[in-house]
Amino acid sequence: MNHESEPSRSLRLGLCCIFRDEPIKFRNTTVKFLRSMDRDAASLKLSTLCLANADALLAALTFCDTAGIGCFRINSQILPVKTHDECGYDVADLPDGPEILSRFKACGTFAKERGIRTSFHPDQFIVLNSPKPDVVDRSVAELEYQAEVAEWVGADVINIHGGGAYGDKPSALAAFARNLARLSDRARTRLTVENDDVTYTPADLLPVCRNEGIPLVYDVHHHRCNQDNISIEEATEQALKTWQREPLFHISSPIEGWDGPKPRRHHDFIDIRDFPECWRGMKLTVEVEAKAKEVAVLKLKRQLAEQWFVYILRCADGSLYTGITNDLDRRLSQHNAGTASRYTRSRLPVVLAYQEKQPHKSAALKRELAIKALSRTAKETLIIQSNV
């Protein structure tokens, strides 16, 4: 199986499952509702929902292609109640079975042609290392269902958490590793594991990933909440080594900030300061776990594309002026036109004496304050050193 997504890109951002503003909806149902119908009516209802969700998936992928979003995470309920003991079904047995399969495969063809990666992230009830055999049985069944759809659409990632520790992490991780043997090849080769915000850190999971050949989906928010003895940079480096295809990581920000009472809760948007500097420029997929969904992804995309600079101008009277901008040429023109700063307005013309790139606006503001606090001699030294 070829897991590579074409065409190759550098950093790509991923949208997770649903939309905030776009009128693209995935449909679901309940076991209670299906039980209220006779068998044929329930089968027809499920068939209709599956067709609608295949069409919604194509619409989602089309939006991603148009918006320049490089990855889409598919909802685990794309085939509603697929593995339920009573109401579960095989797609082939539904009234529109062949058409459902055809439409999902068309989604896979579209995604491949447009270079859009797809992934799955099963719900938290997937626990491969549970001490309860029935929980493991249901987890395996759910992973197999998602692997079936993943094969249709060309998704290369089915991501899960490590599960519980049950008072003994080594034994729990050993059970996780043993139960991998229960998975089919199409599920096993797509399986990834993610560090969580309570139990398993990157340091806990990396040995299992290396021994079992499972890629680590590094979640930097979870790592900041559930820390170990390795840095973000080292965790990134070690996680990258577990991948034989394009790595996939997660980013999110705490809704109440890192000093808030519940830092695990996700914000509507990503604070650009939370995006690891070492991720920039990598050939990497970063799924954006933010409540504002596509709006948050597109905002982060714009922010990552921005270039911020701290600069020093030498004015006509010999004085120095320090500022920040995300458009250096335009800002210099504004200064010389007398529309940028009251200080430089009476000291024209000005020339650019020093510039320093920063990853985002907050970093630029911080650096600006540091440079402003320097003595005149120290600023001149900075200018001289930059020209050497």
Model-predicted segments: where are they?
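Alpha/beta catalytic barrel-like cores
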Residues: 2-117, 124-139, 148-153, 182, ...
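Histidine-centered catalytic micro-motifs
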Residues: 118-126, 216-224
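Active-site flanking residues adjacent to catalytic metal/cofactor-binding acidic residues
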Residues: 120, 193, 218, 288, ...
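Active-site groove signature of glycoside hydrolases
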Residues: 153-167
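Short, conserved beta-strand edge motifs with alternating hydrophobic and charged residues
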Residues: 161, 192-194, 216-221, 250-252
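Multi-pass alpha-helical transmembrane bundles in non-GPCR membrane proteins
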Residues: 169-180, 191-194
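Short acidic, Gly/Ser-rich segments with clustered Asp/Glu that frequently serve as metal-coordination loops
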Residues: 200-201, 221-227
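GIY-YIG nuclease catalytic motif and its immediate N-terminal context
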Residues: 305-388
